[in-house]
């Protein structure tokens, strides 16, 4: 009889992806979480995975229990019950570290761009050969016959340390998660420790001098735009249809590629994927063919059009990510006003990066701010308010609420870019409803 996996916190992006993957491999899967809607639960519901409210009644000794990394006995009754009874359980990252040993594994790490790059690598490889994958947008695919496993490696609290992949990409490093990391050097040390566990090939963005300090027992290949790299993206053309470029390895052209994505960061992400697959011996013609059909990942520059109004939803919640997202919007919509609607995520990050957020958001033409979304791990002690950020932004800025997003209507020929890692989608939904009601009233 097949074992049943129970996920404590199944709506988490990594947890939901892992649950879907195990479900597709034929295992019995269930999980528990809060009632509040989260975008990952749609895939779980479509797959028929049972989602329960948190309760000790969900727990029995015969379950294989996987606990989300954020949960502790003092904030989750199920985990408290598991520990009280002495039942065996694994944290998400511990389970994943053991699970991936049955495959040739390809990890994607980095402060920014992990999910998009993991999604692109998984998309290309699964269209060439049977591949399992786990992406941080809540998407997972499991196949018992797969030789390869593509996964996202998260640096927060050094969760990627149980992983020993054959290959890994490191897109960049940056100071983030100030509730855990003490500074950039601490972040670097975490990535350096992870890099030492990579077995066959490490692919690193080559235009960050700090990344050149990373060491690994695996061969290191640098990628980027400059000629000093091993893999170089050249002859770049950025249009409203995406980006075209050639990639050179050791000064020899290995292919011409098109990726239907926007922003310089997505050219770099694609170059990293190309480099990894080239070193693995994958046919570059096949790689080029399947790069063209990549449709993106959830909450990464996700677009919709409502009555000729363009709305973009993006997970960007760090200044570097905001700049990249706004750059992508300008590439695709060069003649439109770029309106940013941003919700800061966590008080600790907002305090630590306040000036950087102001600089990044000033790349938009107009800015609207939502109230700071606090993490369950922290308390609002009044040290920072969203008004503090608004005061530092040089462009026009204003505050909006879920109940009143009408100030957004004060723009013509605009693209609305909603960004954040909290519940910014509630603001987006309110704006969509407002647009729909306006359309009805004018018909």
UniProtKB/Swiss-Prot annotation:
Show the GO MF annotations: ATP binding; UDP-N-acetylmuramate-L-alanine ligase activity
Q: Which SUPFAM superfamilies match?
A: MurCD N-terminal domain, MurD-like peptide ligases, catalytic domain, MurD-like peptide ligases, peptide-binding domain
Q: Output the Pfam families linked to this UniProt entry.
A: Mur_ligase (PF01225), Mur_ligase_C (PF02875), Mur_ligase_M (PF08245)
Q: Which UniProt keywords apply?
A: ATP-binding, Cell cycle, Cell division, Cell shape, Cell wall biogenesis/degradation, Cytoplasm, Ligase, Nucleotide-binding, Peptidoglycan synthesis
Kind of enzyme, top EC level? Answer: ligase
Domain of life (superkingdom): Bacteria
Residues where ATP binds: 110-116
Entry's Gene3D superfamilies? Mur ligase, C-terminal domain, Mur-like, catalytic domain, NAD(P)-binding Rossmann-like Domain
Q: Which reaction does it catalyse?
A: UDP-N-acetyl-alpha-D-muramate + L-alanine + ATP = UDP-N-acetyl-alpha-D-muramoyl-L-alanine + ADP + phosphate + H(+)
GO CC terms on record?
A: cytoplasm
Q: In which pathway does it act?
A: Cell wall biogenesis; peptidoglycan biosynthesis
Q: What job does the chain carry out?
A: Cell wall formation.
Q: Which family does it belong to?
A: Belongs to the MurCDEF family.
Kindly provide the name given to this protein in its UniProt entry. UDP-N-acetylmuramate--L-alanine ligase
